Amino acid sequence: MNWITNYVRPKINSILRRREIPDNLWIKDPTSGEMVFHKDLEVNQYVIPNSGYHMRISAKNRLMHFFDDGIYTPLENPKVVIDPLKFRDEKRYIDRLKDYRSKLGVDDNILSAQGTIEGLPIVATVQDFAFMGGSLGMASGEAIIKAFDTAIANKCPLVLFSASGGARMQEGTLSLMQMPRTTVAIEMMKEAKLPYIVVLTNPTTGGVTASYAMLGDIHIAEPGAMIGFAGPRVIQQTIRETLPEGFQSSEYLLEHGMIDMVVSRLEMKATIARLLRLIMKCPPAVNPSNPSPTDSQPPLSKAEAA
């Protein structure tokens, strides 16, 4: 009886017990409601195969897919004074920073790296919206300036992926100062006659739009990205008029001449490499590398997903 109670019954219960399924195995498409397996989404660079909806992607994942074979050398971000204003809203700013750093494993929202795309050496800088909404503060400003300095020192182009809600209110004027400081870095880049390409991702707003995000030589946007200075509701309340449908979307801005092109994330690497070769008068790549480091798992097309 003890053998049945202590061994057989627990064994049967463990077999029959329903296995718990992790919450993140299936991702829901916000536009169509379609459920997509998370592995398929990772391979497809977080672009929904059927609808083409571009979900947010982490800075590390973006760089992995962007650089040749997923290989790059991260740049160490400069150290800055933490919470110089001793700011507090619902919680202390320094505690808010600690929470984000513990959750995401990064110091701030900027990740810069050196590597190659189709053999071309470049510096890439990515803003991660997951860290305090990609807000521009002293740390992110210093990191962006260092990326420009590195590109100039190595005589190579810089590609910046913007994703931000604007200036970081917890740092006040110190945050706003990063707008002219990054603008000066861009002028130094232009004086060095080096290309600076901006990729506007969802969302790019506020002080970031009013500074380095709109000062590139070429402006590319991902499909469906929200791009603007103030939000639609603020503008409507100010001008007392109804805004056009799709106002501040990347497609609307392209139609009205505010950006140069709208490019799918799946085609971004090849497009930027082609543009850089034209600008820098480099010969075309003989064997362009796969945009994904996993050559055995190419991005899913709409037909394959169906």
Swiss-Prot record:
Region (Disordered) location: 286-306
PROSITE patterns per UniProt: COA_CT_NTER
EC number annotated for this UniProt entry: 2.1.3.15
Location (main, coarse): cytoplasm
Domain CoA carboxyltransferase N-terminal: 25-294
Pfam families in UniProt: Carboxyl_trans
One Gene Ontology term, aspect cellular component: acetate CoA-transferase complex
Chain intervals with Polar residues compositional bias: 287-299
Keywords assigned: ATP-binding, Cytoplasm, Fatty acid biosynthesis, Fatty acid metabolism, Lipid biosynthesis, Lipid metabolism, Nucleotide-binding, Transferase
Subcellular location: Cytoplasm
Superkingdom, natural source: Bacteria
A molecular function (GO) term: ATP binding
Record's catalysed reaction(s): N(6)-carboxybiotinyl-L-lysyl-[protein] + acetyl-CoA = N(6)-biotinyl-L-lysyl-[protein] + malonyl-CoA
GO biological process, one term: malonyl-CoA biosynthetic process
Enzymatic class: transferase
Protein's UniProt keywords contain ATP-binding: yes
InterPro entries, per database record: AcCoA_carboxyl_beta, Acetyl_CoA_COase_Trfase_b_su, ClpP/crotonase-like_dom_sf, COA_CT_N
Pathway: Lipid metabolism; malonyl-CoA biosynthesis; malonyl-CoA from acetyl-CoA: step 1/1
Quaternary state and interactors: Acetyl-CoA carboxylase is a heterohexamer composed of biotin carboxyl carrier protein (AccB), biotin carboxylase (AccC) and two subunits each of ACCase subunit alpha (AccA) and ACCase subunit beta (AccD).
Family: Belongs to the AccD/PCCB family.
Record-linked HAMAP family: AcetylCoA_CT_beta
Functional description taken from the UniProt entry: Component of the acetyl coenzyme A carboxylase (ACC) complex. Biotin carboxylase (BC) catalyzes the carboxylation of biotin on its carrier protein (BCCP) and then the CO(2) group is transferred by the transcarboxylase to acetyl-CoA to form malonyl-CoA.
The name this protein goes by in its record: Acetyl-coenzyme A carboxylase carboxyl transferase subunit beta
Organism listed in the record: Bartonella quintana (strain Toulouse) (Rochalimaea quintana)
